[in-house]
């Protein structure tokens, strides 16, 4: 292959490399990016505010939140559900009123047709073998097709008004789900499921402001090992203490007793924390972000 042949600017085949390059440049298709360490939160940071927690709580799935942030999130979701429920009830009542109006109009039209038929004077006896139009009863009345065509002409679409275009359809409000879901796991979330977390500081003399500036802030409550994104750790439900998974496997699971409070433990009481990751692919954390965008098909 010659030197200019490597450019491949006049090839007859649209290669996979060229397709991926054009996808990134044009913005079409699924965009994928590899996250670096700067885009990964620390293990003790809130999943909503991405800041070190002052009053941390943890869910049963191991996601840490600031208590104030998660309570504000739950309150906001409940207000949004109430707003959607109000709109749904309004739509339901309007449809009910519309059906009542239609039924009332149908009854009135039947009654009017019956009265017109009873009050009509027939000059000659009706012949069952002749059509109704031949008897002269409905000769003066317009036909149903003419009435429907006139009504249809009144409702012709207007292409310059968005709400009157042929493709415009009234959007129906679906009945909202009253359950509040966790923003990270997508599972139902309740306030009673949030458990407080008690981190053990490296130095008890250092205040919270000085602790935030440090990279190593907390240690294991039992072994005093340093905690970080590279160290798998868990929360003990009875005491809320944070310990390393190595301590859980080697020490705690032998007796299944909380070393801080002395309560009996079960497998459900050991909640593994969701770590932020170290930036390496082998840390067990998904480091690839995807965004679905419109696809251009040939």
From Swiss-Prot:
Location of this chain's protein in the cell: Cytoplasm; Nucleus
Pfam families linked: zf-NOSIP
Record InterPro entries: NOSIP, Znf-NOSIP, Znf_RING/FYVE/PHD
UniProtKB keywords: Cytoplasm, Developmental protein, Nucleus, Transferase, Ubl conjugation pathway
Gene3D superfamilies: Zinc/RING finger domain, C3HC4 (zinc finger)
One function term, GO molecular function aspect: ubiquitin protein ligase activity
E.C. numbers: 2.3.2.27
Entry's Gene Ontology cellular component terms: cytoplasm; nucleus
Domain of life: Eukaryota
Motif (Nuclear localization signal): 78-101
Region (Disordered): 132-156
Reactions that this protein is recorded to catalyse: S-ubiquitinyl-[E2 ubiquitin-conjugating enzyme]-L-cysteine + [acceptor protein]-L-lysine = [E2 ubiquitin-conjugating enzyme]-L-cysteine + N(6)-ubiquitinyl-[acceptor protein]-L-lysine
PANTHER family found in the cross-reference section: ENOS INTERACTING PROTEIN, NITRIC OXIDE SYNTHASE-INTERACTING PROTEIN
Function description: E3 ubiquitin-protein ligase that is essential for proper development of the forebrain, the eye, and the face. Negatively regulates nitric oxide production by inducing nitric oxide synthase translocation to actin cytoskeleton and inhibiting its enzymatic activity.
Family classification: Belongs to the NOSIP family.
Protein name, per record: Nitric oxide synthase-interacting protein
Annotated organism of origin: Xenopus laevis (African clawed frog)
Originating gene: nosip
